[in-house]
From Swiss-Prot:
Native species: Bos taurus (Bovine)
Domain tr-type G: 260-484
Region of interest: G2: 325-329
Gene this protein is translated from: HBS1L
Region (G5): 447-449
Protein name: HBS1-like protein
Keywords on record: Acetylation, Cytoplasm, Elongation factor, GTP-binding, Hydrolase, Nucleotide-binding, Phosphoprotein, Protein biosynthesis, Translation regulation
Positions of post-translational Phosphothreonine modification: 233
Region ranges (G4): 408-411
Residue numbers bearing the N6-acetyllysine modification: 624
Subunit structure: Component of the Pelota-HBS1L complex, also named Dom34-Hbs1 complex, composed of PELO and HBS1L. Interacts with the SKI complex.
Length: 686
């Protein structure tokens, strides 16, 4: 109880004798002299406030801004188009014009930026922008150090630069400013802007460059003259979101890569046919893999007990692929021939990784089919259950028309002509049935391990006595590149998404149509989100532009990485790609065991998208050659039939009609681990 007595009898008044007042000065008990106080005491009253008051936003203004969107019930695509138009108009007008006026102008002119700008700029509110610019120029003029009387004697026309002009015309609009040249006189320090003729369609704007030129008046005259001499030569406008220079893509494509044409090549074939070893040895012989790296691969493969896989490790970079000895994902690299720049894609051959193979084949222009010439190995890959047949059908269904068949491992059969002719006879008949022309298919005997007949014609007497054809590299160089869809709207299908070291994130994929420049605004579908292309990387090198056929990496800002998935398609906001869950298609049924009926579940493979789907309707059976309807509303579809069906996906998918975009109108249907049909989109429902 003593402890409780101590607590009850404790005198708390001793602890509260003096209050500690923090944050303000308390006078001491003794006085201090004024001089000492001025030297050591900080006076808050005499000093200006270091913290400026934060301007608070008016809730009513925000409410009015949000209500302007509510008043106009717009769809998701129209909202994206509206945001794109507002961004372009703000880049030109700045924040001088309220957003509600800009929105009304855009909606009245049906999302036409040219007409909307003309309407807004004709109003009186643009005059406020002109008044502010004149005040800024006059302020910079006083800073020159001249007397106020001499400044007022000059006429206002000599001080204020002429308002520059911006012309918006044509289908593609060029956002830019015409910068007036500023000249300085030694005596008067006056500015003169040469007069330029302008058309009636030109729209007046105060250029920010004109303000910068006026601020240069604080510099000496010889400095201004030196800057004029440097600016006398025309310099291209920097590629940015605000000022972007339009380029001639076709002319730039001819200049790029020394006049060499771009070709996308995919290597396909049955598992263990030697695809990675063949192309890895080809890259080593071309010098794309140095000797030091190759020696490292040889030593590491020997330690792992896979000495024959040394060249395959050039393309199989992951530890799991090297450990299993099987390619699992599409390996991509680049090499050059005499007339071509080849983007090489090494596709997996195992049946478990057919979806990855479809992704690589969908991005290819031509293909190399690798078959094993060993006894029993070719038959295992070519007969039922092998991947040689399925890969051949897949690449033909995905638009590949030119094919080189590399009959590999010919050294194991001592370069026998009989074995080569046996393989070419069986494969040639099958490829002709699959839709390949005989003139577009070439058979080449090779050896991936020894390097025979890869980049130079073989000198082996066992081969030269009966084969006089091209080597593999010469055959690849003789492929004809397809016609690129440069004039069509921009389309890029995302094959990978990753976080960049800097701001934003990166997506990789092949540009299927159109072209892109740094600073372009893009629309991602189906997420329906807009962003800006901050940077473009082609073959690990930064570039300012890229066109159809290029495999690029885009650095994007203004969007959350969570909203982008593999399979999303980037397009221009003005001409977006269509998004739907139901569409009609014409399909060709392959060799299937179970007939296709209404409600049949399938897996839709479209570019890099893999989406579950259901066949909702069987509309009609078509004639293979003429396309005429032979039977309406069939109850089932069997192998070899050509039919018109309606499919429905679980989630929205971005599609294009085959007649408009052949690259984006093809798809494959798989069921239970095998490909059952190939098709093209004929109608998009919703």
């Amino acid at each position: 109880m003593a402890r409780h007595r101590n607590v009850r009898g404790y005198n708390y008044d001793e602890d509260f004798e003096d209050d500690d007042l923090y944050g303000q000065s308390v006078e001491d008990d003794y006085c201090i002299s004024p001089s000492t106080a001025a030297q050591f005491i900080y006076s808050r009253r005499d000093k200006p406030s270091a913290v400026e008051p934060v301007e608070e936003y008016d809730y009513e203004d925000l409410k009015e801004f949000s209500s302007s969107f509510v008043n106009h019930q717009l769809s998701g695509i129209d909202q994206a188009r509206l945001y794109s138009c507002l961004d372009h108009m703000r880049e030109v007008l700045g924040d001088a014009v309220p957003d509600d006026i800009l929105i009304e102008a855009v909606l009245k002119n049906k999302f036409d930026v040219q007409k909307a700008l003309s309407v807004v700029l004709e109003q009186d509110k643009v005059q406020n922008l002109k008044v502010r610019s004149e005040g800024a120029i006059s302020t910079g003029k006083i800073a020159k150090g001249k007397s106020i009387d001499s400044q007022s004697s000059q006429s206002e026309s000599e001080i204020v630069p002429k308002v520059t002009k911006m012309t918006v015309s044509g289908k593609k609009q060029t956002m830019g400013f015409e910068v007036p040249r500023v000249t300085a006189e030694e005596n008067g320090h006056s500015f003169h802007t040469p007069q330029k003729g302008h058309s009636s369609e030109d729209t007046s704007l105060v250029s920010s460059d004109a303000l910068e030129s006026a601020s240069k008046s604080a510099l000496p005259s010889h400095t201004i003259q030196a800057s004029e001499e440097q600016s006398s030569t025309p310099t291209p406008v920097k590629k940015s979101g605000k000022l972007r220079q339009q380029i001639d893509i076709k002319a730039e494509l001819e200049k790029r890569q020394g006049g060499k044409q771009l070709l996308n090549l995919v290597v396909i074939g049955h598992v263990d046919a030697g695809k990675s070893t063949l192309m890895g040895h080809l890259l080593y012989l071309l010098g794309d893999v140095n000797k030091r790296t190759m020696h490292k691969y040889e030593q590491e493969s020997k330690k792992a007990g896979k000495a024959s896989f040394a060249y395959a490790w050039v393309l199989d970079e992951t530890g799991e692929e090297r450990e299993r000895g099987v390619t699992m994902d599409v390996g991509m690299t680049k090499f050059e021939t005499k007339t071509k720049v080849i983007t090489l894609m090494d596709a997996p051959g195992h049946k478990d990784f057919i979806p990855n193979m479809i992704t690589g084949a969908a991005q290819a222009d031509v293909a190399v089919l690798v078959v094993d010439a060993s006894r029993g190995e070719f038959e295992a890959g070519f007969e039922t259950g092998g991947q040689t047949r399925e890969h051949g059908l897949l690449v033909r269904s995905l638009g590949v028309t030119q094919l080189a068949v590399a009959v590999n491992k010919m050294d194991q059969v001592n370069w026998q002509q009989e074995r080569f002719q046996e393989i070419t006879g069986k494969l040639g008949h099958f490829l002709k049935q699959a839709g390949f022309k005989e003139s577009d298919v070439a058979f080449i005997p090779t050896s991936g391990l020894s390097g025979e007949n890869l980049i130079t014609r073989s000198q082996s007497s066992e081969l030269t006595k009966w084969y006089k054809g091209l080597c593999l590299l010469e055959q690849i160089d003789s492929f004809k590149p397809p016609q690129r869809s440069i004039d069509k709207p921009f389309r890029l299908c995302v094959s990978d998404v990753f976080k960049d070291q800097g701001s934003g994130f990166c997506v990789t994929g092949k540009i299927e149509a159109g072209y892109i420049q740094t600073g372009d605004r893009l629309l991602a579908m189906p997420p329906n989100e807009t962003c800006t292309a901050k940077g473009i990387t082609l073959h690990d090198e930064p570039v300012d532009w890229a066109a159809a056929g290029d495999h690029v990496s885009l650095t994007l800002v203004g969007m959350d990485i969570i909203k982008i998935n593999v399979g999303c398609i980037f397009c221009v906001p003005k001409e977006p790609i269509k998004v739907c869950t139901r569409f009609r298609a014409r399909i060709l049924i392959f060799n299937i065991e179970i007939p296709i009926t209404k409600g049949f579940p399938v897996l839709l493979h479209y570019q890099t998208v893999s989406e579950p789907a259901v066949i909702k309707r069987l509309i009609s059976v078509l004639n293979k050659s003429t396309g005429e309807v032979t039977k309406k509303k069939p109850k089932l579809l069997t192998k070899g039939q050509n039919a018109l069906v309606e499919l429905q996906t679980q989630r929205p998918v971005a599609l294009e009609l085959y007649k408009d975009f052949k690259e984006l109108g093809r798809f494959m249907l798989r069921y239970s681990g095998s490909t059952i049909a190939a098709g093209v989109v004929t109608e998009i429902k919703d």
